[in-house]
Amino acid sequence: VLQWLFFQTSGIGPMQGQSNVFLEYFPEKLPSVIKRYQNECIRLYRVLNKQLEDKEYICGDISIADFATFPWVNLYKWAGLEITDFSNIKNWLQRCNERPAFIKGLENPIWKNNKQEDIRIGKKMIGGG
């Protein structure tokens, strides 16, 4: 479980976070930088998709690895990503999104923000807006 938690904290989180920043918040559009982070996200998604091949959750049973990874992967579109080639990830996201605790978590107002408002706040945080 720790290995997959660290996979999220050292891989998916930072790479997808940077993809989000350069795609939506950074004042200049730098296509090569955006593509670099998106490509790394896709590489990490391939690893995650393979891990989920014969499992309902990342480590078999639901764990902190799922709790940490889900919020990032659930917002894949924000990073300009698609998951059409990752059927195991799609199925995992569906299972997570159907769990009562995940549903309750997603009802938190922080997840209800308007994307444009989030972009405005993000740009302000990095000095771009």
Where are these regions (language model features)?
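GST-like fold's C-terminal all-alpha helical module
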Residues: 4-98
